[in-house]
Amino acid sequence: MFRKKMLVLALFSIYFLSIEAVRNESFPALLAFGDSMVDTGNNNYLLTLMKGNYWPYGWNFDSKIPTGRFGNGRVFSDVVGIILKSSLQCFFVISAEGLGIKRIVPAYRKLYIAPSDLKTGVSFASGGAGVDPVTSKLLRVLSPADQVKDFKGYKRKLKGVVGRSKAKKIVANSVILVSEGNNDIGITYAIHDAGMRLMTPKVYTSKLVGWNKKFIKDLYDHGARKFAVMGVIPLGCLPMSRLIFGGFFVWCNFLANTISEDYNKKLKSGIKSWRGASDFRGARFVYVDMYNSLMDVINNHRKYGFTHEKNGCCCMLTAIVPCSNPDKYVFYDFAHPSEKAYKTIAKKLVEDIKTGLA
């Protein structure tokens, strides 16, 4: 009787492990492109003022050491990587971390990238980057073209580790997480001298979607196939925007949010049209709704355990001394969500990604 039970258990184990093996093949890696929402430290290796490798950034990160991430801990790409990998582990396993779940997504420009990280994902993103050609030049960060160039270098390294055939398969099945538009709207268009004088918001947002499509097409031409394209966050509700334009009640900036919504609407519509298009044959796309997800947290912050939705925890005139508990703040600094805010919105968004790209 005991032998029968053990045999049945062994068969079930083999069955479920085989299912998990197939599922793990679905998304072998996470490759992140774009801006500071998904930059894990590439700007550390650039001559730019756009850096997050100093105190108080990284306060809640491992060993409390700043890594170049713009926040108190993990950024959105890290959190997505954790959830994707966790959800793909066999449910028999108690200690997921002991199995080597990807707890962080390393920056591609790090001086050393372990072969295991090449196989499971890196970030090519650069804080301050944008698809408008002016944005990255203005802030001296990695442009979309620079990130595509790094992507090509990554592919060469990956081939050296796993071989040409497997490298091609990994790239084609990886989640390609793209975050663009935030700096284009929030800095280049809204603040840069020429921005609003040259074109209307509606014309500019249409151009942004076109530039984003070109960036994604460049990635597609180099083997990427599964794209999770992030919309912009509610830029009018950033602590910086509230402080400058919010008046006595520190309200959200209506115009900035209207432009953000218009861009997101056009991006979402564009993504629908790209599916099945001849120039994107075999590609899959999913829209990642950052705007409404974060706005829900802002509007219902107490429900999610936050007490501060208007001000950042640090790095502002209203927070020269960092707060004692970043988990109580939706935003860590003047423009970037806290790690807890990312974690709060990520679970639902990752489910959308898995469903849309499966």
UniProtKB/Swiss-Prot annotation:
InterPro entries reported for this sequence: GDSL, GDSL_lipolytic_enzyme, Lipase_GDSL_AS, SGNH_hydro_sf, SGNH_plant_lipase-like
Tissue specificity field: Flower buds.
Signal peptide as annotated in the record: 1-21
Residues carrying sugar: 24
Descriptive protein name: GDSL esterase/lipase EXL5
Known EC number: 3.1.1.-
Catalytic-site annotation from UniProt: 36 (nucleophile), 333, 336
Taxonomic lineage from the root: Eukaryota, Viridiplantae, Streptophyta, Embryophyta, Tracheophyta
Keyword annotations of the record: Glycoprotein, Hydrolase, Lipid degradation, Lipid metabolism, Secreted, Signal
Family: Belongs to the 'GDSL' lipolytic enzyme family.
Compartments where located: Secreted
Primary localisation category: secreted
